[in-house]
């Protein structure tokens, strides 16, 4: 460790000496605006398939800029790799072409430095597209050495804490975040084409609601009140439906003061949509369209590979009622009316854990999670959730024990949650009161009564279909990422000094 620290200190010293040397030669080591004509990938697209002689005849001159991530050669000839946001371009530089002063700058440049390059585009004898340098502008000095170019960052914690180094050294990671942007853009484009209006609603709430989760609490000094970082987008978006907006969506951060694991981060990105006059069947079709658009944004054929398992988003999604799914796997028929004692007995017999305050619907959901959820590999809509676990969903007309709600499962994970929204203010108040009773009985994630939201419903909300999708989990699926931290540029981390 001491030897590594000494090596690092030596490199820091040498790089600062080179910085001073540049200044002595009248060169600003942290340069100025530089105008480039092309990105590396643009040149590859234009000339990558062109014959060597044909390219030479065209006498193509290009100006690029980027970070030098490789350097080789001796004497009066050198090669380097310049990376910009689009990819890599090889440089070929000769002292007799650029002159002694410019070649000296190149020779004294370090891996990590930013260079502006002008030169002729050609192909080497090995067929690699290359720029023969005629002009070099020093743009920025890297005072610290980059991670090893062959191995990148090996410390997982460092990857998340110093994402900028991960992006420099790991092109797969860089590309994953570009895909994230493409996915979100594709979803927005799809919804905009469907006539949705994108809106922004408050992140600071007077009362946490819209989901069963613990909130973060903050304090507003001027008003002298506690406020809650939002745990969901739902209740404000429904207020907009009441106001007549009819077809709205929001993509934004939500915050939950809960545990962290490979699928959960305290702040994450949610998308919710609400459409007047839709029911949950309409929302199923909407959801399929969103997932197909996301898959097409990052694949050529709409088929995504996640951990060596292929998911074909071109095929229609399956649909099954939660009770039927449980019956298929266990033989237990929860369609039959039963008391809480009967349900608890079944749970005991099948080693399904439950809480004392649970009702039959809670136990049905526990059976689903225990025996069914992990088996759902193909995209599958599971609908008909019990009313006890769906306080904001409309009851099913034929069997009011269940709701017009679905969740989308793929490869055993849940990716979307949707309802025919509850628009009866009297029923909504009763659901909130049942949640309040659960909170009193020990469920500290149960919702409070939101009087303002109930009042909004009393002005009248049309039948509405609502949808929620966790964007980060969706991006994990579409980019074959192991952890939510791999799709968040800057995931939540414990401060290093607290270790």
Swiss-Prot record:
Its main location: cytoplasm. Pfam families: tRNA-synt_2, tRNA_anti-codon. Keywords: Aminoacyl-tRNA synthetase, ATP-binding, Cytoplasm, Ligase, Magnesium, Metal-binding, Nucleotide-binding, Protein biosynthesis. Mg(2+) 2 binds at residue 414. One of its GO terms (molecular function) is lysine-tRNA ligase activity. It comes from the Bacteria. Its cofactor is Mg(2+). Its EC number is 6.1.1.6. One of its GO terms (biological process) is lysyl-tRNA aminoacylation. Binds 3 Mg(2+) ions per subunit. It is found in: Cytoplasm. GO terms for cellular component: cytosol. HAMAP family: Lys_tRNA_synth_class2. Belongs to the class-II aminoacyl-tRNA synthetase family. Homodimer. This is Lysine--tRNA ligase.
């Amino acid at each position: 460790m001491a030897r590594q620290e000494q090596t690092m200190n030596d490199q820091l010293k040498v790089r600062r000496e080179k910085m001073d040397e540049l200044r002595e030669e009248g060169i600003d080591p942290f340069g100025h605006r530089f105008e480039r004509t092309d990105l590396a990938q643009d040149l590859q697209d234009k000339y990558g398939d062109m014959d060597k002689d044909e390219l030479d005849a065209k006498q193509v001159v290009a100006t690029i800029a980027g970070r030098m991530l490789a350097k080789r050669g001796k004497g009066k000839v050198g090669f380097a790799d310049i990376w910009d946001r689009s990819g890599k371009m090889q440089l070929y530089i000769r002292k007799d072409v650029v002159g002694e002063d410019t070649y000296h700058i190149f020779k004294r440049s370090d891996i990590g430095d930013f260079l502006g390059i002008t030169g002729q585009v050609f192909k080497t004898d090995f067929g690699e597209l290359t720029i023969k340098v005629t002009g070099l502008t020093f743009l920025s000095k890297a005072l610290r050495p980059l991670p090893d170019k062959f191995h990148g960052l090996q410390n997982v914690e460092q990857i998340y804490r110093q994402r900028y180094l991960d992006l420099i050294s790991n092109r797969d990671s860089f590309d994953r975040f570009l895909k994230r942007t493409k996915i979100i853009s594709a979803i927005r484009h799809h919804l905009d084409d469907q006539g949705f209006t994108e809106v922004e609603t408050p992140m600071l709430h007077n009362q946490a609601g819209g989901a069963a989760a613990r909130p973060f609490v903050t304090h507003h000094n001027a008003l002298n009140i506690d406020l809650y970082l939002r745990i969901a987008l739902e209740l404000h978006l429904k207020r907009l439906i009441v106001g007549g907006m009819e077809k709205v969506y929001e993509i934004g951060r939500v915050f939950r003061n809960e545990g962290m694991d490979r699928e959960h981060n305290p702040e994450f990105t949610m998308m919710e949509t609400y459409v007047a006059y839709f029911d949950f069947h309409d929302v199923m079709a909407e959801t399929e369209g969103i997932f197909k658009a996301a898959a097409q944004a990052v694949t050529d054929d709409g088929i995504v590979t996640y951990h060596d398992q292929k998911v074909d988003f071109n095929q229609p999604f399956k649909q099954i009622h939660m009770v039927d799914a449980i019956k298929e796997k266990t033989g237990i028929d929860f369609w039959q009316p039963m008391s809480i004692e009967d349900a608890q007995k079944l749970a005991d017999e099948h080693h399904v854990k439950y809480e004392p305050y649970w009702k039959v619907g809670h136990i049905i959901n526990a059976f689903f999670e225990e025996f069914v959820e992990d088996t759902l590999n193909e995209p599958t809509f599971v609908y008909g959730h019990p009313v006890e676990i769906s306080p904001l969903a409309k009851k099913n007309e034929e069997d009011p024990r269940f709701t017009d709600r679905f969740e989308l499962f793929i490869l055993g994970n849940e990716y979307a949650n949707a309802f025919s929204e509850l628009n009866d203010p009297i029923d909504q108040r009763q659901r909130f009161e049942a949640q309040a009773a659960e909170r009193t009985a020990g469920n500290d994630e149960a919702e409070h009564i939101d009087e303002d939201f109930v009042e909004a419903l009393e002005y009248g909300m049309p039948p509405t279909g609502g949808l929620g999708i966790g964007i980060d989990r969706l991006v994990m699926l579409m980019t074959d990422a192991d952890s939510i931290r791999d799709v968040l540029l800057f995931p939540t981390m414990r401060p290093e000094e607290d270790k």
